[in-house]
């Protein structure tokens, strides 16, 4: 059974504190938009789909609390301004991930339309917000399952031409239940392969410097008893070169996909794409349509978040043999004191290195002109 990283029931929100994984599984309450902002900024929750969901639901919890306490204004205009201000605030917690900004924009549009209605009140606006927020959680899970099915089918069809009915895949960072409402994007593809008894082995990178692969992806893979091997980031080239491993595909997630297919994802993704091209391994991006930013023409326009030098120069964890219900984390220095550090959280993989983008509506490959064209994915949304 997949992990449930986000629990939302009866207007209460809890998330797994990912800073304590894989040593302790603890759910922490999110009671306000401010709680949501800090949970995202401090990376207690991460993954582009998950942070958008937590942001929107954190405000839902706060709105419900205000309403329950009898402090909600009857004016839809006043409540609308409050919601929009909070949405803008939440977007500042993680600027690179397009899902958060996209969700905030959609909810802002919903608020604006609702306040224009003649019978609109503060109470009806909050009710509409809560309904849409809950649907967002449901839709994300369904979308991830579709991504998994489409991606597994695409990989297996190509493996079959090589006489393979089981495949080895490599993934980077964490794109599973801990990064989404459930199931996952890139890890969802791997889950689907495993469910079809078509996964021979998944290799996951440790994903320095924040170690999401070692801490989170490995945690999910062990939890679900998948055949898995952890490697350091710098071992990927040797793995792809080994004939015994025969990696069929590298599958990664995305924080933002530009209109031309350039993809911003966890630092180290670009390097894997270069290695895949050299070794003739398919390189796939798995992401919902909400991650595709048609307003950003190329990857050069994507703002890359830079994080604290301490993430590179130190490492955190409990001392070996001292893991219990109460986690006592230690910080260990790795680097020479005084060394300068550059710590971009993401890099941008050029579309030329990407073989396909897997979405909940299907797999998009490059056209005959050598470019990605995503417009057809959104035609249904525009007409519905």
UniProtKB/Swiss-Prot annotation:
Q: Which GO terms describe its cellular component?
A: cytoplasm; nucleus
Q: Where is the active site?
A: 255 (proton donor)
Q: Which domain of life is it from?
A: Eukaryota
Q: What is its main location?
A: cytoplasm
Where does the record place it? Cytoplasm; Nucleus
Report the top EC class in one word.
Answer: isomerase
| A Pfam family | IF-2B
EC number from the UniProt entry: 5.3.1.23
Which residues make up the annotated site Transition state stabilizer?
Answer: 173
| Family in the record | Belongs to the eIF-2B alpha/beta/delta subunits family. MtnA subfamily.
PANTHER family per record? METHYLTHIORIBOSE-1-PHOSPHATE ISOMERASE
- Name of the protein: Methylthioribose-1-phosphate isomerase
């Amino acid at each position: 059974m997949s992990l449930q990283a986000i629990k939302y029931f009866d207007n209460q929100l809890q998330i797994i504190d990912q800073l304590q994984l894989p040593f302790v599984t603890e759910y922490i309450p999110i009671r306000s938009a401010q709680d949501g902002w800090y949970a995202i900024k401090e990376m207690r929750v991460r993954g582009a789909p998950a942070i958008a969901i937590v942001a929107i639901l954190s405000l839902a919890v706060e709105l419900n609390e205000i309403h329950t306490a009898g402090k909600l204004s009857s004016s839809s205009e006043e409540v609308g301004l409050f919601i929009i201000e909070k949405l803008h605030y939440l977007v500042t917690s993680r600027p690179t991930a397009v899902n958060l900004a996209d969700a905030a924009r959609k909810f802002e549009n919903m608020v604006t339309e609702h306040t224009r209605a003649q019978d609109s009140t503060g109470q009806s606006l909050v009710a509409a917000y809560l309904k849409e927020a809950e649907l967002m959680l449901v839709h994300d899970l369904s979308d991830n399952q579709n991504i998994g099915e489409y991606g597994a089918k695409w990989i297996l069809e190509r493996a079959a031409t090589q006489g393979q009915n089981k495949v080895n895949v490599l993934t980077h960072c964490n794109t599973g239940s801990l990064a989404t409402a459930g199931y996952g994007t890139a890890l969802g593809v791997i889950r689907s392969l495993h469910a079809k008894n078509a996964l021979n082995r998944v290799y996951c990178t440790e994903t320095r410097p924040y170690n999401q692969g070692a801490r989170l992806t490995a945690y999910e893979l062990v939890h679900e008893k998948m055949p898995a091997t952890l490697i350091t980031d710098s071992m990927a080239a040797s793995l792809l070169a080994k004939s015994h491993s025969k990696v069929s595909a590298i599958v990664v997630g995305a924080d933002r996909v530009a209109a031309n297919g350039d993809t911003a994802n966890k630092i180290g993704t670009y390097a894997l794409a270069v290695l895949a091209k050299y070794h003739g391994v398919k390189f796939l991006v798995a992401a919902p349509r909400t991650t595709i930013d048609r307003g950003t023409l190329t990857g050069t326009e994507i703002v890359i978040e830079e994080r604290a030098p301490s993430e590179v120069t130190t490492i955190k964890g409990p001392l070996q043999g001292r893991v219990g219900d109460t986690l006592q984390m230690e910080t260990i220095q790795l680097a020479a004191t005084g060394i300068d550090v550059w710590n971009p959280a993401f890099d941008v993989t050029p579309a030329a290195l990407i073989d396909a983008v897997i979405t909940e509506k299907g797999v998009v490959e490059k056209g005959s002109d050598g470019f990605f064209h995503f417009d057809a994915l959104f035609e249904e949304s525009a007409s519905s």
